[in-house]
Amino acid sequence: MKRETFRYRGDMDLDGFLREMERVGALGAGRLGRAARILEKMWSSDDVTVLLTVAGPAVAGGLGELFERLIREGLVDAVITSGANVVHDALDALGGIHVCLGERNVDGYGRVHDTHIPTEAFEKFEHFMREVLSDLSGRVSCRELLWEMGKRLESGFLRAAADEGVPIYSPGILDSMVGLHVWIHSQDHDFHLDLVDDMHHLADLVFEAEELGAIILGGSVPKHFAMGAAMLRGGLDYAVQITMDRPETGSLSGAPLEEGKSWEKVREDAEVATIVGDYLIIFPLLASGVMQRLGIV
């Protein structure tokens, strides 16, 4: 296929931009265009079960409302995320305001690079977690805990998932403020967080899928939780990965999706695209453009 050159049009929308990237076809532009085509296939077919995996500071970086929209539009069937994104989604819903104060420490604020949140917001979160946990006892899966949290929030992707019945898995939840409060509560209450039950639930979801797709933002534990489950059925049929990590160190986060075929986590004939870049920038462009393409307003 001949490499084309980018042509600007004054009336170009995001869908048009992505189509132009696909027409160019080369290097990062081509990968972005192919990713849009794969995402379009995943989102336009009722036969594809779509997993969204999220590592890194997605909610602190402003993507929480986009995740909420994807859930409410029925574009994702399950979310696998780090505990930090769960915490920051709850903080936003509880009125904790993320502010951008530059790359510096500020008294009374916790910092994620140039984005800050007041430490008093975590006091509200602590009270919120006590209320949630006080109503739970015995063995509780992580997704059930996150659903209970979502039911008590007025907004955010946790609330959307609770409303729409979309499971949220967080296999590394103990490494977060949620995990800390679970541990504290379990010291003198009959409460056990059952992470194995989440694996049973995800395995059933994967086995029942006619086709399986994944949107992988970052990498780490959420990526592997999805790909490990996909191995139970011979691998993913579709996948788009956006990561800043590189493959030379052998890390999972930097591994291209083609590498997953050697582990049968991705099918040999799967349609995949790995984009190297900041997903906080790339994913909103990609998702918004494909939603335009599908007529979602």
UniProtKB/Swiss-Prot annotation:
EC annotation from Swiss-Prot or TrEMBL: 2.5.1.46
Sections of the chain in a coiled coil: none
Pfam families: DS
Pathway(s) served: Protein modification; eIF5A hypusination
Active site: 265 (nucleophile)
Keywords: Hypusine biosynthesis, NAD, Transferase
Recorded GO MF terms: deoxyhypusine synthase activity
EC main group: transferase
Catalysed reaction equations from the record: [eIF5A protein]-L-lysine + spermidine = [eIF5A protein]-deoxyhypusine + propane-1,3-diamine
Cofactors that this protein relies on: NAD(+)
One GO location term (cellular component): cytoplasm
Family: Belongs to the deoxyhypusine synthase family.
Function, as annotated: Catalyzes the NAD-dependent oxidative cleavage of spermidine and the subsequent transfer of the butylamine moiety of spermidine to the epsilon-amino group of a specific lysine residue of the eIF-5A precursor protein to form the intermediate deoxyhypusine residue.
Entry protein name: Probable deoxyhypusine synthase
Organism this protein belongs to: Methanopyrus kandleri (strain AV19 / DSM 6324 / JCM 9639 / NBRC 100938)
